[in-house]
């Protein structure tokens, strides 16, 4: 799989990435002041062009998680995760029951703008299609890694080497 992290992409950039056979486009809300509605529009274009939309949120908040997932974003990244309690909160916000407690609306892209007759199946399908990625960037998170990995509903884990290096005064040391 090939992907790219984009700080400030345009719709044309997204189309060029699709033509270049990228699989994943990672949009950044942690270090880029892009409006959420614009990120959702870009995410929909990414998905419609056959790529996977990934968005790193600036902080753990219901507003960011709910709006992005309802808008059709496929992978949400939580940066600077510190412990399993934060991971559990992320899952509660990002997954529907029985895994989490995400709020449900039938007027969303992810729900196909309708619930249909099989609402339980819709929730199962949405949970299966939604990926929650946690990013650890500190010694504290590393020390609690086993507890974090045991949280049901956390789908992927990565680390942020730059912030971690800054946090332990190693940035720039080679």
Region spans (language model):
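Conserved N-terminal beta1-alpha1 strand-loop-helix module at the mouth
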Residues: 1-53, 57-60, 92, 132, ...
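Generic hydrophobic/aromatic pocket-lining and core-packing "Φ" positions
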Residues: 14-15, 39, 43, 65, ...
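Glycine/Thr-rich beta-alpha phosphate-binding loop at enzyme active sites
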Residues: 17, 159-174
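Non-catalytic positions within long, well-ordered alpha-helices that form the structural scaffold/packing
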Residues: 18-19, 69, 149-150
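Conserved anion-binding
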Residues: 63, 75-152, 161-166
């Amino acid at each position: 799989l090939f992907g790219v992290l984009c700080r400030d992409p345009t719709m044309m950039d997204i189309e060029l990435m699709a033509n270049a056979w990228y699989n994943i486009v990672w949009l950044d809300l942690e270090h880029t002041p892009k409006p959420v509605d614009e990120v959702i529009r870009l995410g929909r274009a990414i998905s419609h062009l056959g790529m996977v939309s990934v968005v790193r949120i600036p902080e753990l908040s219901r507003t960011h998680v709910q709006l992005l997932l309802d808008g059709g974003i496929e992978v949400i990244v939580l940066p600077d995760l510190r412990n399993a309690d934060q991971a559990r909160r992320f899952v509660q916000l990002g997954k529907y029951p029985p895994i989490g407690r995400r709020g449900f609306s039938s007027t969303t892209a992810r729900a196909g703008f309708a619930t249909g007759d099989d609402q339980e199946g819709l929730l199962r399908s949405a949970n299966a299609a939604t990926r929650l990625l946690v990013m650890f960037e500190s010694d504290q998170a590393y020390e609690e890694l086993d507890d974090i990995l045991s949280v049901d509903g956390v789908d992927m884990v990565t680390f942020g080497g730059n912030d971690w290096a800054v946090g332990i005064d190693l940035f720039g040391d080679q």
